[in-house]
């Protein structure tokens, strides 16, 4: 039996998704699978799991999850996703809920217990299936204990001796930080409770444990990997990251162009390509009509924002400068939800500038596609951005971004006025700098249509493929001395 790369994740599109993590885990494992790498994914069986297109079946009943004090069981379901197995850990008391991590009252009180259980259940499933993986690849705090458990299991259990671990950090700000008493019930050995392990200012930090014990740690862009080594972006974990700097790598995410490409997008009223951009103008007119914007905006630039309405995404900067933008006779579309104060303010501005500003406080996948296609300029004023996917989508849709020069935004956008420019960036994350960059973009759109069309075509030619990212991860696995696909013992 060939040894697999097994991905541990709390989300995987199309089965579950709350943000970019789901997109990544719907694409990267599949890219490796298509490259001939034996690959599997393990994820929770949520109450609102989307399985209509991929029927699931019970594959393991009463899988025993070993805890020091008592056995707990779970059922495991399986789906065939384009020939790749996806396993779903089912235990109703933990995962049969409307949302993944929180509701309107806040984070679920038992999140630590839920995801400690998931990590232990994944390891129990591998045992039950009888074949140790070549690589266990965990993602974010929810699965960060997989590398930690593996580190200690390798010391006592020959089954795991040749398995290596990778932890990918998609956003360092979300760490899974809990009360210290929950460490005692996690099943980690006492020696893991240290400043070089799971302990963080007296709390139990799941992400820190994963960073400490994973064989390799990755982030989702080279720039972000450098940024998190310092206090400005390190979210308190820059110390442990510097200690593990030799094991830290930045690998840029890819974009799923099977889904996000204007040449084959089923959500668009008209498709288009770099050699035939007429469809983009038609998408713009259709979007103006759909959202009830003033028809004259077909002859003016439309600025699109898609993202969570939270401080990290810089939505407050956009709201601050929006009245000033109205003086330039542009349209603004905001799609997203998040902080209630930002939501209310965005809706108030829509009322104040009705016909020129449209705020949709929700997220729908189909409308996101149409905004990418129908906008002229995409706004991404993130205070930090580990990688970012929406700017990659904007580039492919010929919608040059205006973005902060941080993290993955720095790695994916060539800024104006370079002859190879694909967008606009600004250095200081503040309203004045953001406004200047937008006005530069509006000026180019208005006064130099030939230069603008050149930028649009260069943007659409960018290719941040998952195959490229997959090859980088295979190189990383090779550094660990493992070759997925080799026959196991």
UniProtKB/Swiss-Prot annotation:
Signal peptide range equals none
Q: Where does ADP-alpha-D-glucose bind?
A: 17
One of the GO BP terms on file: glycogen biosynthetic process
Enzyme category, top tier: transferase
- CDD domains, A to Z: GT5_Glycogen_synthase_DULL1-like (cd03791)
Pathway connected to this protein: Glycan biosynthesis; glycogen biosynthesis
Under catalytic activity, the entry for this protein gives: [(1->4)-alpha-D-glucosyl](n) + ADP-alpha-D-glucose = [(1->4)-alpha-D-glucosyl](n+1) + ADP + H(+)
GO molecular-function term, one example from the UniProt record = alpha-1,4-glucan glucosyltransferase (UDP-glucose donor) activity
- Give the Enzyme Commission number: 2.4.1.21
For this UniProt record, give its keywords in alphabetical order, as a comma-separated list.
Answer: Glycogen biosynthesis, Glycosyltransferase, Transferase
InterPro entries named among the record's database cross-references: Glyco_trans_1 (IPR001296), GS/SS (IPR011835), Starch_synth_cat_dom (IPR013534)
One Pfam family cited in the UniProt record for this chain: Glyco_transf_5
The UniProt function text for this chain reads: Synthesizes alpha-1,4-glucan chains using ADP-glucose.
Per the record, the similarity remark reads: Belongs to the glycosyltransferase 1 family. Bacterial/plant glycogen synthase subfamily.
PANTHER family for the chain: ALPHA AMYLASE DOMAIN-CONTAINING PROTEIN, GRANULE-BOUND STARCH SYNTHASE 1, CHLOROPLASTIC/AMYLOPLASTIC
Supply the name of the protein. Glycogen synthase
What is the organism of origin for this protein?
Answer: Nitratidesulfovibrio vulgaris (strain ATCC 29579 / DSM 644 / CCUG 34227 / NCIMB 8303 / VKM B-1760 / Hildenborough) (Desulfovibrio vulgaris)
């Amino acid at each position: 039996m060939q040894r697999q790369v097994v991905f541990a994740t709390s989300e995987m599109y199309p089965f579950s998704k709350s943000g970019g993590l789901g997109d990544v885990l719907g694409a990267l494992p599949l890219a490796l699978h298509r490259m001939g790498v034996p690959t599997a994914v393990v994820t929770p069986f949520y109450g609102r799991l989307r399985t209509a297109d991929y029927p699931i079946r019970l594959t393991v009943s009463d899988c025993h999850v070993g805890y020091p004090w008592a056995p707990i069981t779970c059922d495991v379901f399986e789906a065939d996703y384009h020939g790749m197995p996806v396993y779903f850990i089912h235990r109703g008391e933990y995962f049969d809920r409307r949302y993944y991590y929180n509701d309107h009252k806040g984070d679920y009180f038992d999140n630590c217990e839920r995801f400690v259980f998931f990590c232990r259940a994944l390891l129990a499933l591998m045992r039950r299936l009888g074949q140790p993986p070549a690589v266990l690849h965990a993602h974010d705090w929810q699965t960060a204990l997989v590398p930690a458990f593996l580190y200690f299991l390798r010391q006592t259990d020959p089954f795991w001796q040749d398995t290596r671990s990778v932890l990918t950090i998609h956003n360092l700000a979300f760490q899974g930080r809990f009360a210290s008493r929950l460490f005692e019930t996690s099943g980690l050995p006492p020696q893991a409770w240290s400043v070089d392990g799971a302990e963080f200012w007296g709390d139990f930090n799941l992400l820190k444990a994963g960073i400490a014990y994973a064989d390799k740690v990755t982030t989702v862009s080279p720039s972000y990997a450098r940024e998190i080594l310092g206090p400005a972006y390190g979210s308190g974990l820059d110390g442990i990251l510097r200690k593990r700097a030799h094991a830290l790598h930045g690998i840029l995410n890819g974009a799923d162009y099977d889904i996000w490409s204007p040449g084959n997008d089923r959500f668009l009223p008209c498709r288009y390509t770099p050699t035939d951009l007429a469809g983009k103008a038609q998408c713009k007119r259709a979007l103006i009509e759909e959202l009830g914007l003033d028809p004259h905006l077909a002859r003016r630039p439309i600025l699109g924002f898609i993202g969570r309405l939270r401080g990290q995404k810089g939505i407050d900067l956009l709201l601050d400068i929006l009245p000033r933008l109205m003086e330039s006779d542009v349209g603004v579309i905001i799609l997203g939800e998040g902080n209630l104060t930002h939501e209310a303010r965005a809706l108030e501005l829509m009322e104040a500038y009705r016909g020129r500003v449209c705020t949709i406080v929700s997220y729908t996948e189909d409308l996101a596609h149409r905004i990418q296609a129908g906008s002229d300029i995409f706004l991404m004023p993130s205070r930090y951005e580990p990688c970012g996917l929406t700017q990659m989508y904007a580039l492919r849709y010929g919608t040059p971004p205006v973005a902060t020069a941080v993290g993955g935004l720095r790695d994916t956008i060539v800024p104006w006025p370079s002859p190879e420019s694909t967008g606009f960036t600004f250095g200081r994350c503040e309203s004045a700098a953001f406004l200047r960059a937008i006005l530069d973009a509006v000026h180019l759109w208005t006064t130099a249509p030939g230069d603008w069309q050149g930028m649009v075509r260069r943007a659409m030619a960018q290719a941040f493929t998952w195959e490229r990212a997959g090859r980088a991860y295979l190189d990383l696995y090779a550094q660990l001395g493992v070759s997925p696909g080799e026959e196991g013992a």
